[in-house]
């Protein structure tokens, strides 16, 4: 029996129907500004691959790789196999991993805005250090500061978006973070394509321009309202209700406000959320917080995003062609996010994840076959096969962009109860950054060892994650964020694990139904 066979409409439907509100200008602006944090994340993902393909950058910081690229006659797949070079990319994510664990308590105690502002300031410092780097130590320190910014931003922004958005549009608005991320990746690709021609100092401009969205994130964080959930959790009930009325555009927010009060009362009774999250009743959310970000990285998307120009060069593309091809894939990724925004709250999370997984598997297998048959040490891809590889990679990126890209963040951010929400998001970010670090550090060596088989390696993982979603992930579309507990209690598998008193829940639903009917009669 598939995990999503139960329609979410049966989960606290009566309570959810009492929620009122629309997408107001206030909530739209707040979500747009908050999502800028995603653009910085995307920019840092996309910029590294282009920078490490620039000769001036390699000659200054990684001369051995520069000489290997220029003069060595060896396996095409091994041109960039250097652990110090990999550390330039991966150090950012290791720092982000550590920062995300610190960001959890800060986000809970001081609010979502505090973490957004902290992330923006860290980004500014990191961008300045990278742009002015005179040695490898300064370069890596800048990447570490960028990582701290990612740890704070990725912890707070998805939470902020989930809590500000109306229930019926939560998925679409939450994906604003992914849209900003993909826009940042595309922007980085275009910047690299332009600065590649500036030779000696182009890489400095590429790295330094990260300061622009970082400044927007910092200023925006100072101007944004705090989420009503966070204000209520801090005991500011009246202020929380005022913000809720403003962002919903109505005074009739009693049902949603009461859910927030109930959740806050429980949250404030929990003194150790990281310990609480290990309890049996939180097991489904914990499993999703670990597996969703793990699987997102194991799609293999980061081999395209981090190393697109070097990867295309390894396949025989010239320098300009490699940067151009990576810019094309960045544009496809950015545009694909609009598909997810338009469909996630109509078709649901499960449909997008499963169909996207099938498309990614197909594309990766085709690329592996082409490279295995037509490309090797003494072979170069013909123009027609090169174009076919780029098309297949674009179709792979397209599928990721409307499935695992946004939903790998959206699903974990919307399933936790308030008392463990910050802790849960910290775990999601930490797991994501840990596996991002592992893939970023090991990919050049994996590419050298597996050759074309690297695509089959990731295709195998996509097969596993697609089956996982089909079996274990219930549909969260249309379920109020504070009512997710009913979803797990009625799921065919998780109801065997999650303790509870269904009869109490059922009576609560019956009472709410009666109240709703009575109010209509009046």
UniProtKB/Swiss-Prot annotation:
UniProt cross-references to SUPFAM superfamilies, sorted A to Z: MFS general substrate transporter
Main location: membrane
Subcellular location: Membrane
Membrane topology, record value: Multi-pass membrane protein
Cystine pairs: none
Gene Ontology CC, one term: membrane
Sequence ranges on the Cytoplasmic membrane side: 1-22, 474-522
MF GO annotations: monosaccharide transmembrane transporter activity; symporter activity
Keywords of the record: Membrane, Sugar transport, Symport, Transmembrane, Transmembrane helix, Transport
Transmembrane segments: 23-43, 87-107, 121-141, 144-164, 173-193, 205-225, 286-306, 322-342, 351-371, 384-404, 430-450, 453-473
PANTHER family with a match to the protein in the record: SOLUTE CARRIER FAMILY 2, FACILITATED GLUCOSE TRANSPORTER, SUGAR TRANSPORT PROTEIN 7
Assigned protein family: Belongs to the major facilitator superfamily. Sugar transporter (TC 2.A.1.1) family.
Protein name in UniProt: Sugar carrier protein A
Organism: Ricinus communis (Castor bean)
């Amino acid at each position: 029996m598939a995990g999503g066979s139960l329609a979410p409409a049966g989960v606290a439907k009566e309570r959810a129907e009492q929620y009122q509100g629309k997408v107001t200008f206030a909530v739209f602006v707040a979500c747009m500004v908050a999502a800028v944090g995603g653009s910085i994340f995307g920019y840092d993902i996309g910029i590294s691959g282009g920078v490490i393909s620039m000769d001036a950058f390699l000659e200054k910081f990684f001369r051995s790789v520069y000489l290997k690229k220029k003069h060595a006659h060896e396996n095409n797949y091994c041109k960039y196999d250097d652990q110090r070079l990999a550390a330039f990319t991966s150090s950012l994510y290791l720092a982000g991993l550590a920062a995300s664990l610190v960001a959890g308590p800060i986000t809970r105690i001081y609010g979502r805005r505090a973490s957004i502002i902290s992330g923006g300031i860290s980004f500014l410092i990191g961008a300045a250090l990278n742009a002015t780097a005179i040695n490898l130590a300064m370069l890596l320190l800048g990447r570490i500061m960028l990582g701290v910014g990612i740890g704070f931003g990725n912890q707070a922004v998805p939470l902020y978006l989930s809590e500000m958005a109306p229930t019926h549009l939560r998925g679409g608005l939450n994906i604003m973070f992914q849209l900003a991320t993909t826009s940042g990746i595309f922007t980085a690709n275009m910047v690299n394509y332009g600065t590649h021609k500036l030779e000696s100092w182009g890489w400095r401009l590429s790295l330094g321009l990260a300061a622009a969205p970082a400044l927007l994130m910092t200023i925006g964080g100072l101007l944004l309202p705090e989420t009503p959930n966070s204000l209520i959790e801090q005991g500011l009930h009246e202020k929380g209700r005022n913000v809720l009325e403003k962002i919903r555009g109505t005074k009739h927010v009693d049902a949603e406000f009461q859910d927030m009060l109930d959740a806050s009362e429980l949250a404030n009774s929990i003194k150790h959320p990281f310990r609480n999250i290990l309890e049996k009743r939180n097991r489904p959310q914990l499993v999703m917080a670990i597996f969703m970000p793990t699987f997102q990285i194991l799609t293999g998307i980061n081999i395209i995003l981090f190393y697109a120009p070097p990867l295309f060069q390894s396949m025989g593309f010239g320098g300009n062609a490699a940067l151009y091809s990576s810019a094309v894939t960045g544009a496809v990724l950015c545009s694909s996010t609009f598909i997810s925004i338009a469909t996630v709250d109509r078709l649901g999370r499960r449909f997008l994840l499963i169909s996207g997984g099938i498309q990614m598997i197909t594309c990766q297998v085709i690329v592996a076959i082409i490279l295995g048959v037509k490309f090797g040490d003494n072979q170069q891809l013909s123009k027609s096969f090169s174009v076919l590889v780029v098309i297949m990679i674009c179709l792979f990126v397209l599928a990721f962009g409307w499935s695992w890209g946004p939903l790998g963040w959206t699903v974990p951010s919307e399933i936790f109860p308030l008392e463990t929400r910050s802790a849960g998001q910290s775990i999601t970010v930490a797991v994501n950054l840990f596996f991002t670090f592992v893939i970023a550090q090991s990919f050049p060596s994996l590419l050298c060892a597996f050759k074309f088989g690297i695509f089959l390696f990731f295709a195998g993982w996509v097969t596993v994650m697609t089956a996982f979603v089909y079996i274990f992930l219930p549909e969260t579309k249309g379920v109020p964020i504070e009512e997710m507990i009913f979803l797990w209690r009625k799921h065919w598998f998780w109801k065997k694990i999650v303790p509870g008193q269904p009869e109490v829940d059922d009576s609560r639903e019956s009472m709410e139904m009666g109240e709703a009917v009575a109010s209509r009669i009046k």
